[in-house]
Amino acid sequence: MTFSPNRRTILRGTLAATAGVLAGPVLLSGSASAYNWTRTMNEGATGADVTELQIRVAGWAADSASHSRVSIDGDFGPGTAAAVRRFQAAYGLSVDGSAGPATQAQLNALEQSDGSTAHFNWSEFYDRSSGNFNGGKVSAATVKENARRAMYKLEALRKKLGNVPITVNSGFRSIAHNAEIGGASDSMHLYGTAADLDVPGVANRTVYQKAETCGFSGLERYDVDHQHVDSRADLGRAWWWESGTI
């Protein structure tokens, strides 16, 4: 199902809960690295494996700028199928919207043995003060899962930008560290669902534009020294694209 509602600085947004993804309670899928897919999934399928599939294709939410996101609900609907097709096209796979062995193998190629993704590491998302995921607005386990979900969207963004390296300057922030730097009191960084990005050689405006297709519901304006992205709608918050649709 797709919902279509109407590394170093401060998130301005404010953040309420939506089905399947929560602000206070966990956003956990219970997955580990090298996910053990046991079946081909098609539209109409349900289950934990569908949830994991949705997490991994969430960055393929739209073809053009759109307040659309892949719902992480374990229900393989049209939005999930469309995201699978976009993923397949991007990686040179047969485009059929069916998550079979070839698609699953490519999805698993995007993960590392520790559960992070191919081009992003847990350390990039650690609180810059404590070096861990403790002290936020949710548990460390929830922060880690939120960061993992962000990584898969960032993998999609990286692919859409031509496989250029993306540096995460700021990921999760503890409440204490966020206060030290003057961050917003309910910053998405406190939940592990936000990242401030630096993409050398690529204009922030271009990063912003590509991020508009990746299911990011929070985008800070692009005319600053980084590009902020977050998934606040996954926590029930309203969409916020500071520079609008470009």
Spans of features found by a protein language model:
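Extended, low-complexity, intrinsically disordered C-terminal regulatory tails
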Residues: 155-181
